[in-house]
Amino acid sequence: MSSLTGFDKEKMINDLHGVIYKIPNVNEPSLEEYVTADEYLSGNIREKLKIAKISTLIDLQYQDHVDALTKAMPQDLSASEIEVRLGATWIDSDIYEQFMFEILSTSGFAKQHIHITYSKFTDTWNVSNKNWDRGNAKAEKTYGTHRANAYRLIEDCLNLKGTKIFDYEYDDDGKKVAILNKKETMIAQQKQDSIKDAFKNWIWKDFDRREHLTQKYNELFNSTRPREYNGDHLEFPNMNTEITLRKHQKDAIAHILYGNNVLLAHVVGAGKTYEMTAACMELKRLGI
């Protein structure tokens, strides 16, 4: 760029302050790589902010990065804006255990043997020793049935399965055959609905749990900001002077020039033909 403009490097960096950003590199602080603001202030903002804050301990020039990223950060969602379903894998198993023990009033002795675990390899939840808490009315009547106690139903809920109850008979060849018991299945699935409703009412009640889960949800799923391309700097030499491109058209052309893979999902009449034609001419002119 210095050879093209005739300006020295430091002048260009100063003149482009806020338009370009030096990418912080904690492992190699001396490495210099610059990107445009629309690229830097997009993607996983929360992760970039962590790196920028660490980089300020080495070089205070990155404080501008911290300020810009803080402004670009998606606004945190509140608990009322987050829908949590029973079985969501981002929720810790100990929280599910706490819910299960509270609604079923599980005895202290049974708590030592009944546990909820999650396997990332099989993507399944497991409730161990489901039959250990025998005689618990809440597990066998309120939230369960005599054919499927609440611990089994909770396990099926966690795995997003509707519980099915089967009876077994032997056919003429002596083979054991499973026959769906529709009545018991319907009752079991109604109990599952009661468990799901209880979970929705329970999950946000405790203040500390609510704060922990909202923070975790925002960190996991609310950190990304889509890139917004800005085509205001594009000049389009030799374009017909009777054609004036609108703001969204210039931005779409910038997206084509820098994005490599673009879908122009505009409505009819938005000017897609001009966008594609102008982008093709610019790509050709720039030798891209």
Stretch-by-stretch model annotation:
Residues S2-F221, L286:
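Charged, low-complexity intrinsically disordered regions
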Residues E219-I288:
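ASCE P-loop NTPase motor core, strongest for the SF2 helicase catalytic module
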